[in-house]
Amino acid sequence: MSDILTRVISENGKTFGIACDTTALVNEACRKHDVGPLAAVALGRALTGSILMGALLKGDQYLQLKFEGNGPLGKIITEASPDGWCRGYIANPHAELPLLNGRLDVAGGVGHAGLLSVTKDIGMKQKYQGTSHLVSSEIGEDIAYYLTTSEQVPSAVGLGIQLNPNGTIDAAGGFLIQSLPPADEELIASMEEVIANLPSISSMILDGQSPRQMLDKLFGAIPHKETGNSKLKYQCSCSREKMENALISLGAADLASLLTERGEAEVLCEFCRQNYHFAGKDLQEIIDRLKNIQ
């Protein structure tokens, strides 16, 4: 079954909801990055969160989430677009911590002090950038806090990852609910009560519930309608041309030193782990082009 995202809006237009099943793409990301259990859950939550936030964008826009805490997992970066692609990486994929109350200590892995930085490319000359402090380091609450404080849109975010003992992901998904301005405090309180009594996201997915069914539970008695669906996938936008541009950015002198010392270059994409090889003649061609420009 392919991953999917569903959008709904209340009939009065005051509340917008998104839910997604990201089980396959999170498994793909974990496979590519060869992550341990702690990193699998943290990266899975971050990818799912970026998918949900990416669904708020339009057209060719995209966003990047960067979690920079003081925990052993290090930096986590994820990117997503409104058409359903995402990619990401985690700095220390094999970092581990003792269980906390019988559960993986994701907050400890991310670190209790740090920042969430959001960068959006919305087609303007300058990219939009916003930041907020990590409030729980559980990722979902941090995204909700960012949306509520930095973007001034009251939001609730739920993320769930169910890890199999063999290291694969049994279920992954999440939801994002936003109260559109002007905020309806009574409606928000009603939905918060519903959310507090819901089963976990991962358990609903394991029970075979679709994103639409999850949204129906979230909205409860609030009349709402579906506004669209998107298929989701883990997809990297790297290319040999982009990696060549990375080499070009080093400059002719540094490339000449690299050619002398190693005779070739390997450039690894952090997001998908694909390795791009540049032979000595490739490096020399780049150096010659740079010298002709100068």
Curated annotation (Swiss-Prot):
Keyword Aminoacyl-tRNA synthetase: no
Family per record: Belongs to the HSP33 family.
Broad class of where this protein is predominantly found: cytoplasm
S-S bonds: C236-C238, C269-C272
GO molecular function: protein folding chaperone; unfolded protein binding
Signal peptide (UniProt feature, chain positions): none
Post-translational modification: Under oxidizing conditions two disulfide bonds are formed involving the reactive cysteines. Under reducing conditions zinc is bound to the reactive cysteines and the protein is inactive.
Protein name (database record): 33 kDa chaperonin
Keywords from the UniProt entry: Chaperone, Cytoplasm, Disulfide bond, Redox-active center, Zinc
Recorded GO CC terms: cytoplasm
Function per UniProt: Redox regulated molecular chaperone. Protects both thermally unfolding and oxidatively damaged proteins from irreversible aggregation. Plays an important role in the bacterial defense system toward oxidative stress.
Highest taxon in the source lineage: Bacteria
Annotated InterPro entries: Heat_shock_Hsp33, Heat_shock_Hsp33_C, Heat_shock_Hsp33_N
Taxonomic classification: Bacteria, Pseudomonadati, Thermodesulfobacteriota, Desulfobulbia, Desulfobulbales
One Gene Ontology biological process: protein refolding
Keyword Transcription: no
Subcellular location: Cytoplasm
Any Pfam family matching the protein: HSP33
